[in-house]
Amino acid sequence: MCDILIFGGTTEGRQLAEFCAGHGINACISVATEYGAELLPQSEYVHINIGREDASGIAGMIEKLGVSAVIDATHPYAKEVTKNITAACTEKNVTLYRIKRADDAICESAIY
């Protein structure tokens, strides 16, 4: 059983996993790829799930893990997964926290 479910794939997701590992917080970290999993800390407190889930799959994870909170630390442009996470948390009545980057994290020289 995990205390929290973190959807990662960003630096912030990895940092949250490291924090949980260092503070004895049981966390399930869900990443889309094997590469994302390789970047996470190896710890008895960090449980890694690899793969992409739709809203129904995420709701099932929430129920199976029995978490009371979910953290969405996915990439800012990963709109679909954020939509699925939000729908699943609403369905399961679980608190959702979304990690957002500061506006100054946007590269001034980038062309969007």
Feature-to-residue mapping (PLM):
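N-terminal positively charged helical leader segments and presequences
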Residues: 32-36, 41, 46-49, 67, ...
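A short, Lys/Arg-enriched amphipathic alpha-helix followed by its capping loop at the start of a domain
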Residues: 16-27
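Hydrophobic/small residue at the entry helix of a nucleotide-binding pocket
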Residues: 12
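Glycine-rich, highly charged phosphate/nucleotide-binding loops
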Residues: 44-62
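Extreme N-terminal starter segment of soluble prokaryotic enzymes
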Residues: 1-4
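Glycine-rich Rossmann-fold phosphate-binding loop(s) that bind the pyrophosphate
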Residues: 9
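Short, polar loop motifs at secondary-structure junctions
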Residues: 31-37, 99-104
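Glycine/small-residue-rich loop that forms an oxyanion/phosphate-binding "nest" at active or ligand-binding sites
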Residues: 59-112
